Regions:
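Conserved catalytic or regulatory cores that recognize and/or transform ribose-phosphate-containing ligands
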Residues: 2-173
Length: 173
């Protein structure tokens, strides 16, 4: 995985390197891929205000996680047919048009469905990996992190800027 593509600081690189070294170790038996095999991971992180709609870091991390036998639950690539809306691509342009037209009721209905599906993915995930950048507004990411923690799921937070830049709320969770 390219550190430059994610623009990570040293603490974040260390966390990801440690995680990758741990999950990429070969399993001693051929029957079982590893502890993570057949588990589901939700990838939380900025979407609305991310320059690439939050797709880049997820696409970069996904092959490593799939190699470990994980099922990826990605809000930028929803694996469910029940959600009619997505927050990226053409749908993002449509959302912006509705904002410009001040069609708040329609936007609220769309947002409710997006939130419902994303939080349902957090609910069915076995653990969560969250990418947090203090310079990007991440309302949904915080909700997903706190939902994961309320459900007592393992929650890995990769914070751009490292521990020194992390919010006291995240430290307290």
């Amino acid at each position: 995985m390219s550190d430059d593509a994610l623009n990570l600081d040293e603490d974040s690189k260390e966390v990801i390197d440690t995680m990758m070294n741990t999950i990429e170790k070969p399993c001693p038996t051929k029957k079982v891929k590893g502890r993570l095999n057949n588990h589901r991971v939700y990838l939380a992180g900025p979407i609305d205000h991310a320059s690439d709609d939050g797709v880049g870091w997820r696409e970069e991390l996904t092959p490593y996680l799939e190699k470990m036998g994980l099922t990826i639950l990605d809000p930028t690539n929803k694996p469910v047919s029940q959600c009619r809306y997505n927050e990226i691509g053409d749908e993002k342009e449509h959302i912006q048009k509705l904002v410009n037209l001040k069609r708040w009721d329609e936007l609220r209905e769309m947002a409710k469905e997006i939130v419902l599906v994303d939080l349902r993915m957090v609910e069915v995930a076995d653990f969560l990996i969250a990418y947090v950048d203090k310079d990007i507004h991440i309302c949904g990411t915080y909700d997903e992190i706190f939902e994961s923690l309320r459900r007592r799921k393992p929650t890995l937070i990769v914070h751009k800027g490292g521990k020194a830049e992390m919010s006291m709320w995240l430290r307290g969770k």
